[in-house]
Amino acid sequence: MKWVVIDTVIQPTCGISFSAIWGDMKMIIWYQSTIFLPPGSIFTPVKPGIILKDKEYPITIYNIAPFNKNLWSLLKSSQECPPGESEITNKCLHKSCIIKICPYGLK
């Protein structure tokens, strides 16, 4: 089964991400990974992780739940990344970010 990413929220201090996805139904996944799942990406879940662009990546999925608009709004409002000031300076202001390559292109 292929899943399509609608939107992703990253918490850079702990490496946890949440993605709104579409599979058989709209869902929210809570996971930890070294990769970023940008909106529009299509992946297939497999036992050790996911297959994205014909390559397998490890991913730890903590929970999958039916999409809930209120929960997604709460997650989006608590999003730490990217901070608004970074758009002006092109620099990440998070000193404790554990993500090695910024998905937003910040330095």
UniProtKB/Swiss-Prot annotation:
It is found in: Cytoplasm. The lineage of its organism: Bacteria, Pseudomonadati, Pseudomonadota, Gammaproteobacteria, Enterobacterales. The keyword Coiled coil does not apply. It comes from Shigella dysenteriae serotype 1 (strain Sd197). Disulfide bonds: none annotated. Belongs to the IraM/RssC family. This is Anti-adapter protein IraM. Signal peptide: none annotated. The gene is iraM. GO terms for cellular component: cytoplasm. GO terms for biological process: cellular response to starvation.
